[in-house]
């Protein structure tokens, strides 16, 4: 919501790309550091450090994040949460944006929770080798995320979103079909999934942010975030019902989940194409 209010629409995807890259950087650096800190004391210690860093971050946030209160200073009464949710379901564009986010999460989080167990059970990875998947994939997205953001601003969010979804479908297909495979080939496929799977979140988040007027953006994005979190759990639950384990310990039916994820991705392209950008300077309903 802050990015949507502060960054002009023509540069918003680039800003989202940088933010996504910072998440990747935090993961690549933070996870090893967290594990190391745990060895120095116990598992509580990394969380104390994280809390301390969060408190420290409040200082630059206070001084450098601009105040965004133009839409609050109006004399209108504040809406209660029920009214906010009701307005979302009455606004076709916001409803499309909400459904768009849900469909993307169904596509993404039906696959992600089972990558690690599938790699160990079916592909031949050891528990120690799993870290290579996230280390290499996360490291490369540090560089690719800003590029995808710039492309989205230059060539259009819907077009770049469609391209990243189509490209992400390729590694999704192979990841969910793999048997025992050389580690280098597996890392190539999983890295492509990280690049394009995370990459599609950049134009899609920008599209959702731009679908709401500044006055309603914060409340809508909170509702959108909650719906996505619920969908994440639902997607993993559905995938868990489909995937089974045979007598040899191999996971079965992961390919069916892959087909489901690809279909959801195709549907998201269509739904995303119908989302409209609202006037970013209009603070009225």
Place the predicted regions along the sequence by residue.
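Helix-loop-helix hairpin linking two adjacent transmembrane segments in secondary transporters
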Residues: 18-65
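A membrane-interface helix-boundary motif in multi-pass transporters
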Residues: 39-51, 243-263
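Juxtamembrane intracellular "pre-TM" segments in multi-pass secondary transporters
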Residues: 66-98
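C-terminal transmembrane helical hairpin of 12-TM major facilitator-type secondary transporters
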Residues: 158-203
């Amino acid at each position: 919501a802050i990015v949507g209010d502060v960054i002009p629409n023509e540069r918003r995807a680039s800003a989202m790309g940088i933010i996504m890259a910072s998440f990747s950087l935090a993961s690549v650096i933070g996870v090893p550091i967290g594990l190391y800190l745990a060895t120095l004391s116990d598992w509580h210690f990394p969380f104390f450090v994280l809390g301390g860093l969060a408190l420290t971050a409040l200082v630059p946030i206070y001084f450098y994040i601009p105040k965004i209160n133009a839409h609050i200073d109006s004399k209108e009464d504040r809406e209660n949460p029920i009214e906010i949710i009701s307005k979302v379901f009455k606004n076709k564009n916001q409803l499309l944006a909400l459904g768009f986010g849900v469909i993307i999460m169904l596509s993404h989080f039906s696959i992600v929770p089972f990558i690690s167990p599938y790699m160990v059970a079916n592909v031949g990875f050891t528990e120690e080798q799993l870290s290579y998947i996230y280390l290499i994939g996360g490291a490369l997205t540090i560089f690719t995320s800003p590029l995808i953001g710039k492309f989205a601003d230059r060539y259009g969010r819907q077009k770049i979103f469609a391209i990243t979804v189509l490209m992400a479908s390729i590694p999704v297909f192979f990841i969910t079909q793999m048997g025992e495979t050389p580690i280098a080939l597996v890392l190539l496929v999983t890295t492509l999934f990280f690049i394009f799977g995370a990459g599609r979140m950049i134009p899609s988040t920008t599209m959702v942010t731009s679908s709401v007027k500044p006055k309603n953006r914060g409340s809508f994005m909170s509702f959108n975030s909650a719906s996505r979190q619920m969908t994440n759990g639902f997607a993993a639950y559905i995938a868990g019902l489909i995937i089974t384990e045979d007598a040899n310990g191999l996971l079965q039916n992961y390919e069916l989940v892959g087909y489901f994820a690809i279909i959801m991705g195709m549907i998201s392209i269509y739904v995303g194409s119908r989302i409209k950008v609202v006037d970013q300077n209009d603070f009225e309903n």
